[in-house]
Amino acid sequence: MYQRKVRHRPVEAVAREYASFRGKVIIVWDDNIAADMHYAKALFRALTPHGKWWSSQASIYAAKDDEFLELAARSGCKQLFIGLESVSQASLNEVSKAFNRVDEYARAIERIHAHGMSVQAGIVFGFDHDTEAVFEETGDFLESAGVQNATFNILTPYPGTPLHKRLDAEGRILTRDWSTYNGRTHVVFQPRQMSPETLLAGYRYANARFYSLGSIRRRLSKSPTQLFWTLPLNLAYAFALRRDGFNRRAEGK
């Protein structure tokens, strides 16, 4: 899709558009705002005078750059979405993301927190190395690290991707109804170490556990953005999940 290129809008153009929005909170939509550190830091300096709050997405490696974190926080960043993907190093290695080091996750999150920003983690379930224990292990880590928000997804082999080609060759594609390929409501392939039903139930359980009131309370105590950012977002997620029938009792947990 991106043809292996990073494209930039001029910093001044982004800052003008940013300043033109009347709202206090802005989502800066960039798949990895830390992809070009020089550009990112120049952008943060340009955003600082406008006094708004913003969030965006970054790689875990952004947490290693103190200047990046300091400038982001000073410019109004309140949350970074970090694609952790998995708390299993074997699963990360499987999908060529060995550069994500699970043993460095907790420290990276701690560094982001130290600069007054919260973390939203992106998690995927269903890798070949995932066992039924992955749901509890993920929940335990996210709570212990004080992750403020999490977005969970079911691994989905979209048509045209190498993953779909491999699973199709292995006879593991279960349906070609593309409307079910949404990463949330259906498991469209045969997982290696559990049934499709177990994967779907585990995904639902992970959501329900993370956004339970007890988990919210425990994680809130570690949040640098507590009441004005973390609590409203968690309660909104919790309400939406309950509305859609995600609760621990329903999953037998």
What are these regions (language model features)?
Residues S56-A63, E85-L92, I112-S118, A150-Y158, ...:
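Short, surface-exposed, charge-dense and proline/glycine-enriched linear segments
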Residues F21, F141, A145, R209:
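Short alpha-helical functional segments enriched in proximate histidine and acidic residues
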Residues H38, A90, E94-V95, F125-A133, ...:
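Flexible glycine/acidic-rich beta-alpha junction loops that bind and position SAM and/or redox cofactors
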